[in-house]
């Protein structure tokens, strides 16, 4: 079905990273007017300028990623912890705080956050990352319920084992060690293509998902199956 987002105004954050490229491309193919922002969402001081060009949007894709930073809990550095939250949690709050009320005033809107399945199970050695992604998921659940009556649907894709340059670059995926890891840990025994995740984002951004609110949808090939 072509043109599922015809003339819909879409903001995709951090579009050069994580799932940004695949989502921006698919949404444009479906007729959306995509504003794909390559930069990381700025801190509070620069946020007003960042959103000033998007007074009205129909769809927000909160695509927020931070470079992997794995360490035992005893070795977590304050700077690494704060970096995770400054890049992924605080921007999500500011984006939804700004755009959800505007959507509510107009009586419609979609917000899709690309988060992670990691906090659904927990990853030893990645406590900081799990904490930040878990905060994102909790925020989506709460705000999704808060804005449901205003016909604004806020949901998240909690993914893992999806091809993307930040967490699963091609050279890692191609290695024998990683392929063996997939077979042991992922029931579907493969990694997802970026376009597969983008298709789920498209569904959540379209009118077909109007009855879904506050959902954190696992997309991990069976590695995580519930929230």
Briefly describe each language-model feature range.
Residues 3-35:
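Canonical Rossmann dinucleotide-binding motif of NAD(H)/NADP(H)-dependent dehydrogenases/reductases
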Residues 42-45, 52, 65-82, 105, ...:
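Conserved mid-core segment of classical short-chain dehydrogenase/reductases
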Residues 71-73, 77-85, 111, 178, ...:
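Substrate-binding pocket helix/loop in short-chain dehydrogenase/reductase
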Residues 121, 202, 213-227:
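Short C-terminal tail/terminal secondary-structure segment
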